[in-house]
UniProtKB/Swiss-Prot annotation:
GO terms for molecular function: RNA binding. This is Maturase K. The keyword DNA damage does not apply. Keywords: Chloroplast, mRNA processing, Plastid, RNA-binding, tRNA processing. Usually encoded in the trnK tRNA gene intron. Probably assists in splicing its own and other chloroplast group II introns. Belongs to the intron maturase 2 family. MatK subfamily. The lineage of its organism: Eukaryota, Viridiplantae, Streptophyta, Embryophyta, Tracheophyta. One of its GO terms (cellular component) is chloroplast. GO terms for biological process: mRNA processing; RNA splicing; tRNA processing.
Protein backbone atom coordinates (compact mmCIF):
# COMPACT_ATOMS: atom_id res chain seq x y z
CA UNK A 1 0.00 0.00 0.00
CA UNK A 2 2.94 2.32 0.48
CA UNK A 3 3.67 1.91 -3.22
CA UNK A 4 0.09 2.86 -4.04
CA UNK A 5 0.38 5.92 -1.82
CA UNK A 6 3.63 7.00 -3.47
CA UNK A 7 2.16 6.60 -6.91
CA UNK A 8 -0.90 8.57 -5.93
CA UNK A 9 1.16 11.33 -4.37
CA UNK A 10 3.29 11.69 -7.48
CA UNK A 11 0.33 11.76 -9.84
CA UNK A 12 -2.94 13.01 -8.41
CA UNK A 13 -4.68 12.44 -11.75
CA UNK A 14 -3.92 8.71 -11.49
CA UNK A 15 -5.15 8.74 -7.92
CA UNK A 16 -8.49 10.27 -8.85
CA UNK A 17 -9.20 8.60 -12.19
CA UNK A 18 -7.58 5.17 -12.22
CA UNK A 19 -8.42 3.36 -9.00
CA UNK A 20 -10.30 0.61 -10.83
CA UNK A 21 -7.15 -1.26 -12.06
CA UNK A 22 -6.15 -1.85 -8.44
CA UNK A 23 -8.92 -4.45 -8.15
CA UNK A 24 -7.11 -6.61 -10.75
CA UNK A 25 -3.85 -6.86 -8.78
CA UNK A 26 -3.36 -10.02 -6.79
CA UNK A 27 -1.01 -8.25 -4.38
CA UNK A 28 -3.93 -6.24 -3.07
CA UNK A 29 -5.82 -9.39 -2.08
CA UNK A 30 -2.70 -10.80 -0.47
CA UNK A 31 -2.46 -7.66 1.66
CA UNK A 32 -6.12 -7.89 2.64
CA UNK A 33 -5.66 -11.61 3.37
CA UNK A 34 -2.80 -10.90 5.77
CA UNK A 35 -4.71 -8.10 7.45
CA UNK A 36 -7.79 -10.28 7.87
CA UNK A 37 -5.73 -13.07 9.45
CA UNK A 38 -4.11 -10.59 11.83
CA UNK A 39 -7.48 -9.27 12.97
CA UNK A 40 -9.10 -12.70 13.22
CA UNK A 41 -6.15 -14.20 15.08
CA UNK A 42 -6.26 -11.41 17.64
CA UNK A 43 -9.98 -11.93 18.23
CA UNK A 44 -10.03 -15.74 18.36
CA UNK A 45 -7.53 -18.46 19.26
CA UNK A 46 -5.44 -20.10 16.57
CA UNK A 47 -7.00 -23.50 17.17
CA UNK A 48 -10.35 -22.08 16.08
CA UNK A 49 -9.01 -21.08 12.68
CA UNK A 50 -10.24 -23.53 10.08
CA UNK A 51 -8.15 -25.02 7.33
CA UNK A 52 -10.33 -23.20 4.80
CA UNK A 53 -8.91 -19.84 5.95
CA UNK A 54 -6.23 -19.95 3.29
CA UNK A 55 -5.91 -17.70 0.31
CA UNK A 56 -6.49 -19.27 -3.08
CA UNK A 57 -5.38 -17.08 -5.97
CA UNK A 58 -7.53 -19.19 -8.27
CA UNK A 59 -10.61 -17.96 -6.42
CA UNK A 60 -9.23 -14.44 -6.49
CA UNK A 61 -8.89 -14.63 -10.27
CA UNK A 62 -12.48 -15.81 -10.52
CA UNK A 63 -13.56 -12.82 -8.47
CA UNK A 64 -11.56 -10.53 -10.72
CA UNK A 65 -13.25 -12.13 -13.71
CA UNK A 66 -16.66 -11.38 -12.24
CA UNK A 67 -15.65 -7.77 -11.71
CA UNK A 68 -14.51 -7.50 -15.34
CA UNK A 69 -17.84 -8.86 -16.58
CA UNK A 70 -19.75 -5.99 -14.91
CA UNK A 71 -22.67 -8.37 -14.35
CA UNK A 72 -24.67 -6.91 -11.48
CA UNK A 73 -27.05 -9.87 -11.46
CA UNK A 74 -24.23 -11.97 -10.00
CA UNK A 75 -23.72 -11.03 -6.39
CA UNK A 76 -20.08 -10.51 -5.63
CA UNK A 77 -19.93 -12.94 -2.72
CA UNK A 78 -22.33 -15.72 -3.68
CA UNK A 79 -19.77 -17.95 -5.40
CA UNK A 80 -17.42 -17.74 -2.46
CA UNK A 81 -19.75 -18.88 0.28
CA UNK A 82 -23.45 -19.71 0.41
CA UNK A 83 -23.93 -17.50 3.45
CA UNK A 84 -25.06 -13.95 2.62
CA UNK A 85 -23.02 -10.93 3.56
CA UNK A 86 -25.32 -9.83 6.34
CA UNK A 87 -25.06 -13.11 8.25
CA UNK A 88 -23.12 -13.10 11.46
CA UNK A 89 -20.86 -15.87 10.22
CA UNK A 90 -19.35 -14.09 7.26
CA UNK A 91 -17.33 -16.08 4.83
CA UNK A 92 -13.60 -15.78 4.66
CA UNK A 93 -13.56 -14.56 1.06
CA UNK A 94 -16.25 -11.99 1.75
CA UNK A 95 -14.03 -10.49 4.42
CA UNK A 96 -11.01 -10.60 2.13
CA UNK A 97 -12.82 -8.84 -0.70
CA UNK A 98 -14.21 -6.25 1.69
CA UNK A 99 -10.69 -5.64 3.00
CA UNK A 100 -9.42 -5.19 -0.56
CA UNK A 101 -12.26 -2.82 -1.40
CA UNK A 102 -11.58 -0.79 1.72
CA UNK A 103 -7.86 -0.59 0.96
CA UNK A 104 -8.56 0.77 -2.52
CA UNK A 105 -11.04 3.36 -1.28
CA UNK A 106 -8.70 4.47 1.51
CA UNK A 107 -5.97 5.47 -0.96
CA UNK A 108 -7.39 8.86 -2.07
CA UNK A 109 -8.67 9.77 1.38
CA UNK A 110 -5.41 9.01 3.17
CA UNK A 111 -3.49 11.09 0.62
CA UNK A 112 -5.97 13.92 0.95
CA UNK A 113 -5.86 13.87 4.75
CA UNK A 114 -2.05 13.95 4.81
CA UNK A 115 -1.95 16.89 2.42
CA UNK A 116 -4.57 18.70 4.49
CA UNK A 117 -2.61 18.24 7.69
CA UNK A 118 0.62 19.40 6.07
CA UNK A 119 -0.99 22.56 4.75
CA UNK A 120 -2.56 23.76 7.97
CA UNK A 121 -1.95 24.04 11.67
CA UNK A 122 -3.47 20.85 12.99
CA UNK A 123 -3.43 21.99 16.59
CA UNK A 124 -6.13 24.55 15.81
CA UNK A 125 -8.46 22.19 14.02
CA UNK A 126 -8.14 18.87 15.78
CA UNK A 127 -8.18 17.88 19.41
CA UNK A 128 -8.03 14.40 20.85
CA UNK A 129 -10.61 13.01 23.22
CA UNK A 130 -8.41 14.03 26.14
CA UNK A 131 -9.20 17.69 25.47
CA UNK A 132 -12.96 17.31 25.21
CA UNK A 133 -13.57 17.83 28.92
CA UNK A 134 -11.24 20.87 29.24
CA UNK A 135 -12.93 22.22 26.13
CA UNK A 136 -16.31 21.89 27.84
CA UNK A 137 -14.98 23.67 30.91
CA UNK A 138 -13.53 26.56 28.91
CA UNK A 139 -16.23 27.14 26.30
CA UNK A 140 -19.56 25.95 27.67
CA UNK A 141 -19.79 28.41 30.61
CA UNK A 142 -19.61 31.28 28.10
CA UNK A 143 -22.49 29.89 26.03
CA UNK A 144 -26.17 30.35 26.74
CA UNK A 145 -27.70 27.67 24.50
CA UNK A 146 -26.71 24.36 23.01
CA UNK A 147 -27.92 22.30 20.08
CA UNK A 148 -27.93 18.56 20.63
CA UNK A 149 -27.71 17.28 17.05
CA UNK A 150 -27.41 13.56 16.54
CA UNK A 151 -25.86 12.46 13.27
CA UNK A 152 -28.35 10.40 11.21
CA UNK A 153 -26.93 6.93 10.71
CA UNK A 154 -29.43 5.58 8.15
CA UNK A 155 -28.75 6.50 4.53
CA UNK A 156 -29.71 5.17 1.12
CA UNK A 157 -26.83 3.30 -0.57
CA UNK A 158 -27.12 5.26 -3.82
CA UNK A 159 -26.74 8.56 -1.96
CA UNK A 160 -23.67 7.18 -0.23
CA UNK A 161 -22.19 6.17 -3.60
CA UNK A 162 -22.92 9.61 -5.05
CA UNK A 163 -21.05 11.26 -2.21
CA UNK A 164 -18.06 9.12 -3.12
CA UNK A 165 -18.24 10.51 -6.65
CA UNK A 166 -17.29 13.92 -5.25
CA UNK A 167 -13.90 12.50 -4.30
CA UNK A 168 -13.33 9.73 -6.85
CA UNK A 169 -13.78 10.39 -10.54
CA UNK A 170 -13.25 6.79 -11.56
CA UNK A 171 -16.85 5.58 -11.87
CA UNK A 172 -16.03 1.86 -12.48
CA UNK A 173 -14.17 1.69 -9.17
CA UNK A 174 -17.46 2.41 -7.39
CA UNK A 175 -19.33 -0.53 -8.94
CA UNK A 176 -18.00 -3.05 -6.37
CA UNK A 177 -18.93 -0.61 -3.61
CA UNK A 178 -22.43 -0.30 -5.02
CA UNK A 179 -22.76 -4.09 -5.21
CA UNK A 180 -21.69 -4.50 -1.59
CA UNK A 181 -24.02 -1.78 -0.31
CA UNK A 182 -27.04 -3.07 -2.22
CA UNK A 183 -26.39 -6.63 -1.10
CA UNK A 184 -26.31 -5.48 2.49
CA UNK A 185 -29.42 -3.37 1.89
CA UNK A 186 -31.38 -6.29 0.41
CA UNK A 187 -30.35 -8.77 3.08
CA UNK A 188 -33.17 -10.40 5.08
CA UNK A 189 -31.83 -9.01 8.36
CA UNK A 190 -32.03 -5.40 7.17
CA UNK A 191 -35.68 -4.48 7.59
CA UNK A 192 -35.21 -0.74 7.03
CA UNK A 193 -33.87 -1.21 3.48
CA UNK A 194 -31.15 1.36 4.09
CA UNK A 195 -27.49 1.38 5.03
CA UNK A 196 -27.02 1.65 8.77
CA UNK A 197 -23.72 3.48 9.16
CA UNK A 198 -22.64 3.10 12.78
CA UNK A 199 -19.15 3.26 14.31
CA UNK A 200 -19.87 0.32 16.62
CA UNK A 201 -19.58 -2.26 13.85
CA UNK A 202 -16.07 -3.60 14.33
CA UNK A 203 -15.11 -4.06 10.70
CA UNK A 204 -12.71 -1.98 8.70
CA UNK A 205 -15.22 -1.47 5.91
CA UNK A 206 -17.99 -0.06 8.10
CA UNK A 207 -15.55 2.00 10.14
CA UNK A 208 -14.31 3.52 6.91
CA UNK A 209 -17.89 4.24 5.81
CA UNK A 210 -18.61 5.90 9.14
CA UNK A 211 -15.49 8.06 9.09
CA UNK A 212 -16.12 9.08 5.49
CA UNK A 213 -19.79 9.81 6.16
CA UNK A 214 -19.03 12.01 9.17
CA UNK A 215 -16.23 13.75 7.26
CA UNK A 216 -18.58 14.50 4.38
CA UNK A 217 -21.34 15.79 6.64
CA UNK A 218 -19.09 18.12 8.58
CA UNK A 219 -17.06 19.39 5.64
CA UNK A 220 -20.17 20.35 3.66
CA UNK A 221 -21.87 21.78 6.73
CA UNK A 222 -19.04 24.13 7.59
CA UNK A 223 -18.32 25.10 4.00
CA UNK A 224 -21.97 26.06 3.48
CA UNK A 225 -22.03 27.94 6.76
CA UNK A 226 -19.01 29.98 5.74
CA UNK A 227 -20.49 30.57 2.29
CA UNK A 228 -23.84 31.79 3.60
CA UNK A 229 -22.25 33.98 6.25
CA UNK A 230 -19.28 36.26 6.55
CA UNK A 231 -17.29 34.68 9.34
CA UNK A 232 -13.80 34.86 10.68
CA UNK A 233 -13.16 31.28 11.65
CA UNK A 234 -10.20 29.42 12.94
CA UNK A 235 -8.61 27.06 10.45
CA UNK A 236 -10.34 23.72 10.48
CA UNK A 237 -10.54 20.55 8.44
CA UNK A 238 -12.10 17.12 8.39
CA UNK A 239 -10.04 13.98 8.78
CA UNK A 240 -11.53 10.66 7.67
CA UNK A 241 -9.42 8.67 10.12
CA UNK A 242 -10.09 10.92 13.10
CA UNK A 243 -13.27 10.61 15.14
CA UNK A 244 -12.97 13.12 17.99
CA UNK A 245 -12.33 16.79 17.35
CA UNK A 246 -13.91 20.19 17.81
CA UNK A 247 -14.08 23.46 15.94
CA UNK A 248 -14.81 27.04 16.76
CA UNK A 249 -16.47 29.67 14.59
CA UNK A 250 -16.74 33.21 15.87
CA UNK A 251 -17.83 36.69 14.83
CA UNK A 252 -20.50 35.67 12.34
CA UNK A 253 -22.35 38.34 10.36
CA UNK A 254 -25.25 36.81 8.45
CA UNK A 255 -26.39 38.66 5.33
CA UNK A 256 -29.99 38.64 4.23
CA UNK A 257 -30.33 37.22 0.71
CA UNK A 258 -33.39 39.32 -0.12
CA UNK A 259 -32.01 42.77 0.62
CA UNK A 260 -28.29 42.28 0.92
CA UNK A 261 -27.59 46.00 0.46
CA UNK A 262 -30.15 47.37 2.90
CA UNK A 263 -30.67 44.72 5.55
CA UNK A 264 -27.67 43.37 7.42
CA UNK A 265 -28.20 41.41 10.60
CA UNK A 266 -25.09 41.72 12.74
CA UNK A 267 -24.66 39.57 15.80
CA UNK A 268 -22.81 41.12 18.68
CA UNK A 269 -19.87 38.87 19.44
CA UNK A 270 -21.62 35.57 18.72
CA UNK A 271 -19.68 32.36 19.10
CA UNK A 272 -20.45 28.87 17.89
CA UNK A 273 -18.51 25.99 19.41
CA UNK A 274 -18.69 22.54 17.89
CA UNK A 275 -17.60 19.39 19.67
CA UNK A 276 -18.31 15.79 18.72
CA UNK A 277 -17.84 12.65 20.75
CA UNK A 278 -18.50 9.60 18.58
CA UNK A 279 -21.79 10.05 16.75
CA UNK A 280 -23.13 12.72 19.10
CA UNK A 281 -22.12 16.31 18.27
CA UNK A 282 -22.97 19.27 20.49
CA UNK A 283 -23.09 22.87 19.25
CA UNK A 284 -22.74 25.51 21.96
CA UNK A 285 -23.96 28.95 20.94
CA UNK A 286 -23.51 32.34 22.52
CA UNK A 287 -26.01 34.70 21.02
CA UNK A 288 -29.64 35.63 20.70
CA UNK A 289 -32.43 33.09 20.68
CA UNK A 290 -33.04 33.89 17.02
CA UNK A 291 -29.54 32.62 16.18
CA UNK A 292 -30.27 29.33 17.93
CA UNK A 293 -33.49 28.88 15.96
CA UNK A 294 -31.73 29.68 12.69
CA UNK A 295 -28.93 27.18 13.39
CA UNK A 296 -31.43 24.47 14.27
CA UNK A 297 -33.44 25.16 11.12
CA UNK A 298 -30.27 25.19 9.04
CA UNK A 299 -29.20 21.76 10.31
CA UNK A 300 -32.57 20.23 9.48
CA UNK A 301 -32.68 21.74 5.99
CA UNK A 302 -29.05 20.81 5.35
CA UNK A 303 -29.68 17.12 5.99
CA UNK A 304 -32.85 17.18 3.92
CA UNK A 305 -31.41 18.76 0.79
CA UNK A 306 -27.83 17.49 0.71
CA UNK A 307 -28.36 13.94 1.93
CA UNK A 308 -32.07 13.50 1.13
CA UNK A 309 -32.71 12.58 4.74
CA UNK A 310 -35.81 13.53 6.61
CA UNK A 311 -34.52 14.32 10.09
CA UNK A 312 -37.09 14.21 12.82
CA UNK A 313 -37.23 17.51 14.74
CA UNK A 314 -36.31 15.81 18.00
CA UNK A 315 -32.92 14.82 16.55
CA UNK A 316 -31.88 18.48 16.72
CA UNK A 317 -33.08 19.82 20.05
CA UNK A 318 -32.09 23.12 21.64
CA UNK A 319 -32.20 24.21 25.25
CA UNK A 320 -30.58 26.70 27.59
CA UNK A 321 -27.64 25.59 29.65
CA UNK A 322 -28.68 27.59 32.70
CA UNK A 323 -32.07 25.85 32.95
CA UNK A 324 -31.63 22.39 31.46
CA UNK A 325 -29.05 19.62 31.48
CA UNK A 326 -27.38 18.03 28.50
CA UNK A 327 -26.11 14.46 28.50
CA UNK A 328 -22.70 13.91 26.93
CA UNK A 329 -20.42 12.02 27.15
CA UNK A 330 -21.70 10.01 30.07
CA UNK A 331 -22.35 13.07 32.24
CA UNK A 332 -25.26 15.37 32.93
CA UNK A 333 -23.84 18.73 31.87
CA UNK A 334 -25.15 22.01 33.23
CA UNK A 335 -23.81 25.51 33.89
CA UNK A 336 -24.12 26.88 37.41
CA UNK A 337 -23.37 30.26 38.92
CA UNK A 338 -20.37 30.20 41.22
CA UNK A 339 -19.87 33.27 43.46
CA UNK A 340 -16.25 34.12 44.24
CA UNK A 341 -15.13 36.50 46.98
CA UNK A 342 -12.35 38.80 45.76
CA UNK A 343 -10.46 41.21 48.04
CA UNK A 344 -8.69 44.18 46.50
CA UNK A 345 -6.52 46.71 48.31
CA UNK A 346 -6.12 50.30 47.09
CA UNK A 347 -4.58 53.23 48.98
CA UNK A 348 -4.38 51.35 52.26
CA UNK A 349 -8.09 50.65 52.14
CA UNK A 350 -9.61 47.21 51.91
CA UNK A 351 -12.47 46.69 49.46
CA UNK A 352 -14.46 43.50 49.26
CA UNK A 353 -16.11 42.66 45.97
CA UNK A 354 -18.28 39.68 45.11
CA UNK A 355 -17.80 38.36 41.60
CA UNK A 356 -20.11 35.81 40.01
CA UNK A 357 -18.71 33.50 37.37
CA UNK A 358 -20.16 30.61 35.40
CA UNK A 359 -18.62 27.17 35.39
CA UNK A 360 -19.54 23.80 33.98
CA UNK A 361 -20.95 21.37 36.50
CA UNK A 362 -20.75 17.73 35.36
CA UNK A 363 -23.15 15.59 37.38
CA UNK A 364 -22.65 11.88 37.88
CA UNK A 365 -25.78 10.03 36.67
CA UNK A 366 -26.12 7.69 39.65
CA UNK A 367 -29.58 6.34 38.82
CA UNK A 368 -28.66 5.37 35.21
CA UNK A 369 -25.44 3.76 36.47
CA UNK A 370 -27.42 1.67 38.95
CA UNK A 371 -29.76 0.72 36.12
CA UNK A 372 -26.83 -0.46 34.02
CA UNK A 373 -25.42 -2.41 36.97
CA UNK A 374 -28.81 -4.05 37.35
CA UNK A 375 -28.75 -4.96 33.66
CA UNK A 376 -25.35 -6.59 34.16
CA UNK A 377 -26.70 -8.55 37.16
CA UNK A 378 -24.65 -6.79 39.85
CA UNK A 379 -27.77 -5.59 41.65
CA UNK A 380 -31.51 -5.44 41.26
CA UNK A 381 -33.53 -2.49 40.00
CA UNK A 382 -33.72 -0.93 43.47
CA UNK A 383 -29.93 -1.07 43.86
CA UNK A 384 -29.66 -4.04 46.22
CA UNK A 385 -26.44 -5.98 45.50
CA UNK A 386 -26.72 -9.53 44.22
CA UNK A 387 -24.13 -12.15 43.34
CA UNK A 388 -22.69 -12.34 39.83
CA UNK A 389 -23.48 -16.00 39.15
CA UNK A 390 -21.73 -16.09 35.77
CA UNK A 391 -18.39 -15.35 37.49
CA UNK A 392 -18.56 -18.08 40.10
CA UNK A 393 -16.52 -20.40 37.86
CA UNK A 394 -13.55 -18.01 37.93
CA UNK A 395 -10.77 -17.97 40.48
CA UNK A 396 -10.88 -15.67 43.48
CA UNK A 397 -8.17 -13.44 42.06
CA UNK A 398 -10.00 -13.08 38.75
CA UNK A 399 -13.23 -12.17 40.50
CA UNK A 400 -11.48 -9.57 42.65
CA UNK A 401 -9.63 -8.15 39.65
CA UNK A 402 -12.81 -7.79 37.60
CA UNK A 403 -14.73 -5.99 40.33
CA UNK A 404 -11.66 -3.91 41.03
CA UNK A 405 -11.39 -2.90 37.37
CA UNK A 406 -15.06 -1.91 37.19
CA UNK A 407 -14.75 0.35 40.21
CA UNK A 408 -11.50 1.90 39.02
CA UNK A 409 -13.05 2.68 35.65
CA UNK A 410 -16.07 4.32 37.23
CA UNK A 411 -13.98 6.31 39.70
CA UNK A 412 -11.55 7.56 37.07
CA UNK A 413 -14.21 8.45 34.56
CA UNK A 414 -16.40 10.39 36.99
CA UNK A 415 -13.59 12.02 38.96
CA UNK A 416 -14.23 15.15 36.91
CA UNK A 417 -17.39 15.89 38.87
CA UNK A 418 -17.47 18.07 41.98
CA UNK A 419 -20.10 15.97 43.71
CA UNK A 420 -18.84 12.41 43.92
CA UNK A 421 -20.84 11.35 46.97
CA UNK A 422 -23.09 9.17 44.85
CA UNK A 423 -20.10 7.08 43.82
CA UNK A 424 -19.85 5.74 47.36
CA UNK A 425 -23.18 4.04 46.82
CA UNK A 426 -21.78 2.45 43.65
CA UNK A 427 -18.75 1.39 45.68
CA UNK A 428 -21.01 -0.23 48.27
CA UNK A 429 -22.98 -2.10 45.57
CA UNK A 430 -19.85 -3.45 43.88
CA UNK A 431 -18.09 -4.44 47.10
CA UNK A 432 -21.13 -6.27 48.46
CA UNK A 433 -21.80 -7.91 45.09
CA UNK A 434 -18.18 -9.09 45.03
CA UNK A 435 -18.54 -10.53 48.53
CA UNK A 436 -21.79 -12.28 47.61
CA UNK A 437 -20.20 -13.73 44.47
CA UNK A 438 -17.31 -15.17 46.47
CA UNK A 439 -19.69 -16.49 49.13
CA UNK A 440 -21.84 -18.15 46.48
CA UNK A 441 -18.77 -19.74 44.92
CA UNK A 442 -17.45 -21.19 48.19
CA UNK A 443 -20.97 -21.92 49.52
CA UNK A 444 -20.31 -19.72 52.51
CA UNK A 445 -21.62 -16.47 53.99
CA UNK A 446 -20.64 -12.86 53.43
CA UNK A 447 -19.37 -12.56 57.01
CA UNK A 448 -16.96 -15.46 56.49
CA UNK A 449 -15.73 -14.02 53.19
CA UNK A 450 -15.09 -10.58 54.70
CA UNK A 451 -13.35 -12.17 57.67
CA UNK A 452 -11.06 -14.22 55.44
CA UNK A 453 -10.27 -11.50 52.91
CA UNK A 454 -10.43 -8.48 55.20
CA UNK A 455 -8.68 -5.53 53.58
CA UNK A 456 -7.92 -7.58 50.48
CA UNK A 457 -11.42 -6.84 49.20
CA UNK A 458 -10.93 -3.98 46.72
CA UNK A 459 -7.51 -3.33 48.23
CA UNK A 460 -5.88 -2.38 44.94
CA UNK A 461 -8.19 0.35 43.72
CA UNK A 462 -9.18 1.95 47.03
CA UNK A 463 -5.66 2.05 48.40
CA UNK A 464 -4.40 3.59 45.17
CA UNK A 465 -7.08 6.27 45.21
CA UNK A 466 -6.33 7.20 48.82
CA UNK A 467 -2.61 7.32 48.12
CA UNK A 468 -3.18 9.40 45.00
CA UNK A 469 -5.23 12.04 46.76
CA UNK A 470 -3.04 12.09 49.85
CA UNK A 471 0.00 12.84 47.72
CA UNK A 472 -1.77 15.39 45.55
CA UNK A 473 -3.52 17.37 48.27
CA UNK A 474 -1.90 18.37 51.51
CA UNK A 475 -3.78 18.80 54.76
CA UNK A 476 -3.85 22.59 54.36
CA UNK A 477 -5.58 22.28 51.01
CA UNK A 478 -8.14 19.69 52.10
CA UNK A 479 -11.02 22.11 51.73
CA UNK A 480 -9.78 23.33 48.38
CA UNK A 481 -9.41 19.77 47.09
CA UNK A 482 -13.14 19.22 47.43
CA UNK A 483 -13.71 21.90 44.78
CA UNK A 484 -11.17 20.55 42.30
CA UNK A 485 -11.83 18.02 39.61
CA UNK A 486 -9.40 15.67 37.94
CA UNK A 487 -9.69 14.47 34.35
CA UNK A 488 -7.79 11.24 33.84
CA UNK A 489 -6.00 10.72 30.53
CA UNK A 490 -7.03 7.06 30.25
CA UNK A 491 -10.76 7.70 29.99
CA UNK A 492 -10.99 6.73 26.27
CA UNK A 493 -10.39 3.12 27.26
CA UNK A 494 -12.99 3.03 30.02
CA UNK A 495 -16.07 4.62 28.49
CA UNK A 496 -18.25 1.64 27.42
CA UNK A 497 -20.56 2.44 30.32
CA UNK A 498 -20.91 6.03 29.17
CA UNK A 499 -21.67 4.90 25.63
CA UNK A 500 -24.26 2.41 26.85
CA UNK A 501 -25.94 5.00 29.02
CA UNK A 502 -25.94 7.52 26.16
CA UNK A 503 -27.58 4.96 23.90
CA UNK A 504 -30.31 4.40 26.49
CA UNK A 505 -30.88 8.16 26.71
CA UNK A 506 -31.26 8.36 22.91
CA UNK A 507 -33.79 5.53 22.89
CA UNK A 508 -35.82 7.24 25.61
CA UNK A 509 -35.97 10.46 23.61
CA UNK A 510 -36.95 8.65 20.41
CA UNK A 511 -39.68 6.68 22.16
CA UNK A 512 -40.99 9.87 23.74
CA UNK A 513 -41.44 11.54 20.36
CA UNK A 514 -42.77 8.42 18.65
CA UNK A 515 -45.73 8.23 21.02
Amino acid sequence: MDEFHRCGKEDSFWQQCFLYPLFFQEDLYAISHDHYLDVSSSSRPMEHLSSNDQLSFLTVKRLIGQIRQQNHSIVLFVNCDPNPLADRKKSFYSESVLEALTLVLEVPFSIWSKSSVEGMNESKSFRSIHSIFPFLEDKFPHSNSILDARIPYSIHPEILVRTFRRWIRDAPSLHPLRSVLYEYRNSPDNLQRSIIVVPRVNTRFFLFLWNYYVCECESILFSRLKRSSHSRSLSHGSFPHRTHFHRKIKHIIIFSRRNSLKSIWSLKDPKIHYVRYGERPIIAIKGAHLLVKKCRYYLLIFRQFYFHLWSEPYRVCSHQLSKNCSSSPGYFLRVRMNPILVRTKMLDELFIADLITDEIDPIVPIVPIIGLLATEKFCDISGRPISKLSWTSLTDDDILDRFDQIWRNLFHYYSGSFDRDGLYRIKYILSLSCAKTLACKHKSTIRVVRKELGPELFKKSFSKEREFYSLRFSSKAAARSQRERIWHSDIPQINPLANSWQKIQDLKIENLFDQ
